[in-house]
Swiss-Prot record:
Gly residues composition-biased segments: 655-665
Keyword flag Manganese: no
Name of protein: Heat shock 70 kDa protein
Regions of compositional bias (Low complexity) in chain numbering: 666-675
Highest taxon of source: Eukaryota
Protein species of origin: Plasmodium falciparum
Signal peptide: none
InterPro entries the record matches: ATPase_NBD, Heat_shock_70_CS, HSP70_C_sf, HSP70_peptide-bd_sf, Hsp_70_fam
Lineage: Eukaryota, Sar, Alveolata, Apicomplexa, Aconoidasida
Keyword Nucleotide-binding among UniProt keywords: yes
Sequence segments annotated as region (Disordered): 655-681
Length: 681
């Protein structure tokens, strides 16, 4: 992709940082330049890129190219990695999602979910982090092509309700993609920056961000005043979004097909299901602007065509429980922030699913008729805010971002297990981060030599109902009666929402600590290093494959160009029949070889092109010698010869990539030498 024209970014080259919204279904990337955010289009010209990765017999595809071939290759096209990242295979949400996915998910070490695909004829297993890293790498490449510079630094967004292990896993994905992840920030907070960046000096405002995307849902309540963005409360569901609405529509159509076709069940056919899902997603989008949508698919299953018209009312009925559930976190944040509905100055809708009219209506009714703000693009707001935060962290001195301060919160309470399996909270949810809190604990039994510190996150009274983040031992406590030793435990949560826990025995000063990395769910450093190397290898393979395809296309263009010219009556008249036959025979033989060798190597294609050129170029150049003789010699001071390449393609629709050697030149000039050839209209 050519780099975009425009002035250079106002940061030193090494300091350029991008903001990436890594979405469940689509991702988006932005960069701060010239006092504004540029949302960067991909090589297809789209400002959002599908979070899809496909594996075929020959190549790896990412983004639009992957999504476009999903119906042909459903088992090896991976999406929804965000619904797996940082989770365990046994979690109910993972088990439920697996019923809708055409690709295979298996349980790996420590119940880590592993995605199985066939790539280049071999079975391969990937961690969700690796799939996400491939999407991130694509976003990085899009930004590099746009800026014409190498990029290392990035801010990546996550749902506000992502837990510690999901945040760590997202950070790991960035590392595997070759990025230095400067900060992990919450999606609704990023959207609030997009909303409030240019609204300074208008007094204190309470903003509710309602962020419903493809796979996750967040609500955050912020106070914005003079460039200070303070999150008051956050709530949500990391497993609710547009895909769940798609699933309802798909299930409806599967049952409808069964009813219309004597019980035929297409749900076990992954290709039919994928084609149906694509049309259901399209219908859902149509229903945001029309009152009905028709789903039509030729030969959907066992040769049977399928057609159904779905009204907006029917779609709303299918999903009404989901739609109503979105209001529960809204009530929760208002309660947590100790605020009533009337105190909310603005409701900002973010995420593609907020385009659904019923959701807009429910929010309007909830806020007593208040219209939601539509001044920001729901698909791009999160990446916009991430790009602003990236600029701040990389030291940008622009006026717009200079005085901007972001005060985010931790979304879940953090604590440890005490006697009886009780959850003792040290950091309450919605505490502003970074935060540090210490508390004194003691032993439960006489002469207890050590303690086990078990760290949990969650809101339930007993630890068994919460999420274990990690544990460690503090040993070497001097013998003493119970309740005498003093153990100071400190929880320190950083700006990424990632936790460090330290325990110190006061009398001896003995201490131990843990960075909560959810050892069971998280990748080891060795695994990350291996994945970084694999990512480089896959990237090199992609590049090699691109060059191979270019060489094949070059050979094909050359052959068809010569063939087309030889079929032109005017050109035929200038050549001997034997010469035409020689050229035609060579070209036909090579085209037949091409047909049988679609997967040949780059060198083989280039060798065949040289072979074709060595036979055809001297003969074809005679046409131009005649013309040049009549016109008083060829340009470039070579009477009767050709200047290393043909600056303006041959008549008859011919297009010689890399130029064509003339009569006085060796007949095997490599493709790519000489001026670029353009086709004459």
């Amino acid at each position: 992709m050519a780099s975009a024209k425009g002035s250079k970014p106002n940061l030193p080259e090494s300091n350029i940082a991008i903001g990436i919204d890594l979405g469940t279904t689509y991702s988006c990337v932005g960069v701060w330049r010239n006092e504004n955010v540029d949302i960067i289009a991909n090589d297809q010209g789209n400002r959002t890129t599908p979070s899809y990765v496909a594996f075929t017999d020959t190549e790896r595809l990412i983004g639009d190219a992957a999504k476009n071939q999903v119906a042909r290759n459903p088992e090896n096209t991976v999406f929804d990695a965000k619904r797996l990242i940082g989770r365990k295979f046994t979690e109910s949400s993972v088990q439920s999602d697996m019923k809708h996915w055409p690709f295979t998910v298996k349980s790996g070490v420590d119940e880590k979910p592993m995605i199985e695909v066939t790539y280049q004829g071999e079975k391969k297993l990937f961690h969700p982090e690796e799939i996400s890293s491939m999407v991130l790498q694509k976003m990085k490449e899009n930004a590099e092509a746009f800026l014409g510079k190498s990029i290392k630094n990035a801010v990546i967004t996550v749902p506000a309700y992502f837990n510690d292990s999901q945040r760590q896993a997202t950070k790991d994905a960035g590392t595997i993609a070759g990025l230095n992840v400067m900060r992990i920030i919450n999606e609704p907070t990023a959207a609030a920056i997009a909303y409030g960046l240019h609204k300074k000096g208008k007094g204190e405002k309470n903003i509710l961000i309602f962020d419903l995307g493809g796979g996750t849902f967040d609500v955050s309540l912020l106070t914005i005043e003079d460039g200070i963005f303070e999150v008051k409360a956050t709530a949500g569901d990391t497993h609710l979004g547009g895909e769940d609405f798609d699933n309802r529509l798909v299930n409806f159509c599967v049952e409808d097909f069964k009813r219309k076709n004597r019980g035929k069940d297409l749900s076990k056919n992954s290709r039919a299901l994928r084609r149906l899902r694509t049309q259901c997603e399209r219908a859902k989008r149509t229903l945001s602007s029309s009152t009905q949508a028709t789903i039509e698919i030729d030969s959907l299953f066992e040769g049977i065509d399928y057609s159904v018209t779905v009204s907006r009312a029917r779609f709303e009925e299918l999903c009404i429980d989901y739609f109503r559930d979105t209001l529960i976190p809204v009530e929760k944040v208002l309660k947590d922030a100790m605020m009533d509905k009337k105190s909310v100055h603005e409701v900002v809708l973010v995420g593609g699913s907020t385009r659904i009219p019923k959701i807009q209506t429910l929010i309007k009714e909830f806020f007593n008729g208040k219209e939601a703000c539509r001044s920001i693009n729901p698909d791009e707001a999160v990446a916009y805010g991430a790009a602003v935060q990236a600029a701040i962290l990389s030291g940008d001195q622009s006026n717009a971002v200079q005085d901007l301060l972001l005060l985010d919160v931790c979304s879940l309470s953090l604590g440890l297990e005490t006697a009886g399996g009780v959850m003792t909270k040290l950091i309450e949810r919605n505490t502003t981060i970074p935060a540090k809190k210490s508390q004194i604990f003691t032993t439960y039994a006489d002469n207890q030599p050590g303690v086990l510190i078990q760290v949990y996150e969650g809101e339930r009274a007993l630890t068994k109902d919460n999420n274990l983040l990690g544990k460690f031992h503090l040993d070497g406590i001097p013998p003493a009666p119970r309740k005498v030793p003093q153990i100071e435990v400190t929880f320190d949560i950083d700006a990424n929402g990632i936790l460090n826990v330290t325990a110190v025995e006061k009398s001896t000063g003995k201490q131990n600590h843990i960075t909560i990395t959810n050892d069971k769910g998280r990748l080891s450093q060795d695994e990350i290093d291996r994945m970084v190397n694999d990512a480089e290898k896959y990237k090199a393979e992609d590049e090699e494959n691109r060059k191979r395809i270019e060489a094949r296309n070059s050979l094909e263009n050359y052959c068809y160009g010569v063939k087309s010219s030889l079929e032109d009556q005017k050109i035929k008249e200038k050549l001997q029949p034997a010469e035409i036959e020689t050229c035609m025979k060579t070209i036909t033989t090579i085209l037949e070889w091409l047909e049988k060798n679609q997967l040949a190597g780059k060198d083989e294609y280039e060798a065949k092109q040289k072979e074709a050129e060595s036979v055809c170029a001297p003969i074809m150049s005679k046409i131009y010698q005649d013309a040049a003789g009549a016109a008083g010699g060829m340009p470039g001071g070579m009477p009767g010869g050709m200047p290393g390449g043909m600056p303006s393609g041959m008549p008859g629709g011919m297009n010689f990539p890399g130029g064509m050697p003339g009569a006085g030149m060796p007949g095997n000039a490599p493709a790519g030498s000489g001026p670029t050839v353009e086709e004459v209209d």
